[in-house]
């Protein structure tokens, strides 16, 4: 998939997460694999409702910023671990759906 199309999809999914209430304020983050061991990711401290294609960052496989004005989000290391251990995974989304958060707060085992 082309980088511009991937950027558009990350923006679309960011806005969907926000619209559904699955992320609050600056919570949650998204990333996607692009060519040559690089990754697109959402910036830190940005509402998912306000994510824009030109505001996305490009990072290398260790999570170091290559392009973009903002800093990468703090959980990027988790995303990188997923990509390293699962080469078939093309994108990672970290959200906080209210029902999942409520279940986690109960301490019940799955």
Task: Please give the residue ranges for each predicted region.
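Glycine-rich flexible loops
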Residues: 1-110
């Amino acid at each position: 998939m082309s980088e511009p199309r991937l950027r558009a999809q990350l923006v679309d999914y960011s806005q969907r997460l926000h619209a559904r209430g699955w992320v609050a304020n600056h919570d949650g983050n998204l990333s996607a694999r692009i060519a040559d061991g690089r990754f697109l990711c959402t910036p830190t401290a940005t509402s998912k409702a306000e994510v824009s294609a030109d505001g996305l960052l490009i990072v290398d496989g260790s999570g170091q910023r290559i392009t973009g004005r903002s800093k990468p989000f703090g959980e990027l290391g988790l995303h990188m671990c997923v990509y390293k251990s699962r080469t078939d995974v093309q994108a990672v989304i970290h959200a906080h759906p209210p029902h999942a958060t409520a279940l986690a707060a109960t301490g019940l085992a799955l």
